Amino acid sequence: MRVTLVVLLALFLALQYRLWFGKNSLPDYWRLQQEVSNQKNTNENLERRNQLIYADIEDLREGEDALEERARNELGMVKKDEVFFRLVPDRNP
């Protein structure tokens, strides 16, 4: 009986060691859960960004207003017979 108890105790301790410190232990599992959660958040952010980009692409394909706005803001273009004034702040106030 005593030998069986010692063997069972040794087996229990070996399994506990693997559970807490071995490969695929609980701390590894918790770390991987955190990594999966972080990756899901990153994927959601990228999905939202992609949706915005798709909306911009659709606006550029559909209407001229978005195209004109981009040309004005990003390329500094102006319409024919239109005057553009740039106000530069004074460097020495």
From Swiss-Prot:
Residues 22-93 are periplasmic. It holds the Pfam family DivIC. GO terms for cellular component: cell division site; cell septum; plasma membrane. Residues 28-75 form a coiled coil. Belongs to the FtsB family. One of its GO terms (biological process) is FtsZ-dependent cytokinesis. This is Cell division protein FtsB. Its main location: membrane. NCBIfam families: PRK00888.1. The gene is ftsB. It comes from Idiomarina loihiensis (strain ATCC BAA-735 / DSM 15497 / L2-TR). Keywords: Cell cycle, Cell division, Cell inner membrane, Cell membrane, Coiled coil, Membrane, Transmembrane, Transmembrane helix.
